[in-house]
């Protein structure tokens, strides 16, 4: 049975929109990783730079100081480790420590050395759709054009197709209607040759699905609804804060999809 991968978020920042300050020391980060492993996580995604609206950019030195001690402490655990960074210097330092994957929210557009570094260490990379919100074509067409162009550049740099993931970038450089359009047409991204990661956890999109004001934690059940929807559309992984809830849901949806496919094959 094909298993949807659960990527658990580990923000080692003081200011992330959902859990800033909770895991920004090594001991608390280790405890959270152990808990996520018990809850069924497949990948831990360590991030040292907040992406919340209005966040301040941190220096390279500060990002290194936040991320490296935590990565060094958890890289020996029996779980795949990803680092959420758009800086090749941070990526290389973490890859040297043994991480498996780089999650680049700028898809190699911020730092053109990123692909060469990831290829050098034979690692995986996630390319997320981003931008300034100004576009000359409809959002899905622009997203597909941009991501496929960057995936092509990644392959030229030496990263094989099966190690390149695409993320539609819900919550980044898109209006509410554009996010809804991207979600409705996820299957078009899935139809590419690349595995797709969906990352909606606790974001504005899930708040707007509910139709009233909520705290980030109160959006977990609606996040799980997007997980179910994404899996039915064909995404291969989801990036979430609440690992236990989404791991259980994904297991159930995976079973139902496998059951449906098996019965169709019999007919």
From Swiss-Prot:
Q: Part of which pathway? A: Cofactor biosynthesis; tetrahydrofolate biosynthesis; 7,8-dihydrofolate from 2-amino-4-hydroxy-6-hydroxymethyl-7,8-dihydropteridine diphosphate and 4-aminobenzoate: step 1/2
Which InterPro entries does the annotation name? Answer: DHP_synth-like, DHP_synth_dom, Dihydropteroate_synth-like_sf, Pterin-binding_dom
Protein residues bound to (7,8-dihydropterin-6-yl)methyl diphosphate: 51, 84, 103, 167, 203, 239-241
Q: Where are the transmembrane segments?
A: none
The answer to whether the entry has keyword Transferase is: yes
Query: Quick one: a GO biological-process term for this protein?
Result: folic acid biosynthetic process
Q: Which ranges carry the Pterin-binding domain? A: 1-251
Q: Which cofactor does it need?
A: Mg(2+)
Q: Which GO terms describe its cellular component?
A: cytosol
Annotated function: Catalyzes the condensation of para-aminobenzoate (pABA) with 6-hydroxymethyl-7,8-dihydropterin diphosphate (DHPt-PP) to form 7,8-dihydropteroate (H2Pte), the immediate precursor of folate derivatives.
Q: How does it assemble?
A: Homodimer.
Q: Which family does it belong to?
A: Belongs to the DHPS family.
Per its UniProt record, what PANTHER family does this chain match? FOLATE SYNTHESIS PROTEINS (PTHR20941), FOLIC ACID SYNTHESIS PROTEIN FOL1 (PTHR20941:SF1)
Query: Could you tell me what this protein is called?
Result: Dihydropteroate synthase
Origin organism lineage: Bacteria, Bacillati, Bacillota, Bacilli, Bacillales
Gene that codes for this?
A: folP
């Amino acid at each position: 049975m094909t298993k949807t991968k659960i990527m658990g978020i580990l923000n080692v920042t003081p200011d992330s929109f959902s859990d800033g300050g909770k895991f920004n020391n090594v001991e608390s980060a280790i405890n959270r990783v152990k808990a996520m492993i018990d809850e069924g996580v497949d990948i831990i995604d360590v991030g040292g730079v907040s992406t919340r609206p209005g966040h301040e950019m941190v220096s390279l030195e500060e990002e290194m100081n936040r991320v490296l001690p935590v990565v060094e402490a958890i890289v020996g655990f029996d779980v795949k480790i990803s680092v959420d960074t758009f800086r090749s210097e941070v990526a290389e330092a973490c890859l040297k420590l043994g991480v498996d994957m780089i999650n680049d929210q700028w898809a190699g557009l911020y730092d053109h050395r990123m692909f060469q570094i990831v290829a050098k260490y034979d690692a995986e990379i996630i390319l997320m759709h981003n931008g300034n919100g100004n576009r000359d074509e409809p959002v899905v067409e622009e997203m597909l054009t941009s991501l496929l162009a960057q995936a092509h550049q990644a392959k030229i740099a030496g990263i094989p197709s099966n190690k390149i993931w695409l993320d539609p970038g819900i919550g980044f450089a898109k209006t509410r209607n554009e996010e809804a359009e991207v979600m409705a047409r996820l299957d078009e991204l899935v139809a590419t040759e690349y595995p797709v990661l969906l990352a909606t956890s606790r974001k504005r999109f899930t708040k707007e699905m509910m139709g009233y004001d909520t705290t980030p934690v109160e959006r977990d059940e609606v996040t799980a609804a997007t997980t179910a929807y994404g899996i039915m559309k064909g995404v291969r992984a989801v990036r979430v804060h609440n690992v236990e809830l989404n791991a259980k849901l994904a297991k159930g949806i995976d079973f139902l999809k496998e059951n449906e496919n098996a019965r169709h094959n019999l007919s």
